[in-house]
């Protein structure tokens, strides 16, 4: 046993220090990034935000809506091959460019992903997702996926430390998904005592990944557009959002009515709700590590997407970044004990 004394920070612990700017308007800011990925060699351009691969966020409907904003969607792994085929038959090439195919690490997951990718060559992204990316089996699966799909861009996670980030990149991942426990409906930290404050995880993993020519996506912990800006400021190449995109018409959650008001269910993918739906319940050897919440219906996701992108553009103007690419170079974080004036938050 040992104790690390270095302070680790989350998004709530910092603000971005403003700096002089020559920008005249938020409209001057370019949010589109262009990436060429280390292993696949593929080039992609777009706004590097990803809707999370949760079945109450990462739906086909979400992909259709967010593609209009140049945003990616990691479509959840619980769609059948037949459902994928029906979606691909109606989706435009531009929508497919903004889609990630999500998978687990079982043999059945692998075979299903092989079939899905064979449906259309425009499916260029694979998101390999497990709660704990530190297992040797996971590393081996990433290597297997790279061998099977040499020209596909592979995103793999989740991890929170530099050495494991490097391991996954060396095994074939183009993008490493960073985050253990920060999600709005994740209870891993309280159930297991395991985790890592998200901003520090992003900073440390970005440093490790970029040294090898890889990239990272910050997954979890964002509650408002300012957190998205902080994640990019900390060095994230992509930012994945779950709770911020939940509760919308495109989100796919079940709708319930209470006292005449409608709510949408949103749950973590290791929650009892998710396991009851997809694997027949919580196995005897494990505990649920997620919760289920009821969100007031929030309408079309487009309104939220505009709010997120508007906040991100504004953050760039405050530090003089004319392009999103410049934000991390121009970011200085200051430690704080308050984020906002909350006097009217209860009204």
UniProtKB/Swiss-Prot annotation:
Record keyword NADP present: yes
Residues annotated for NADP(+) binding in this entry: 108-131, 216-239
Active-site residues annotated for this sequence: 186
Any single Gene Ontology cellular-component annotation: GMP reductase complex
Keywords: Metal-binding, NADP, Oxidoreductase, Potassium
Gene3D superfamilies reported for this sequence: Aldolase class I
Binding-site positions, K(+): 181, 183
Enzyme kind, highest EC tier: oxidoreductase
Transmembrane segments: none
BP GO annotations: purine nucleotide metabolic process
GO molecular function, one term: GMP reductase activity
SMART domains tied to this protein: IMPDH
Organism superkingdom: Bacteria
Assembly mode: Homotetramer.
Record family assignment: Belongs to the IMPDH/GMPR family. GuaC type 1 subfamily.
Summary of the function given for this chain in its UniProt record: Catalyzes the irreversible NADPH-dependent deamination of GMP to IMP. It functions in the conversion of nucleobase, nucleoside and nucleotide derivatives of G to A nucleotides, and in maintaining the intracellular balance of A and G nucleotides.
Stated name of the protein: GMP reductase
Organism: Salmonella typhi
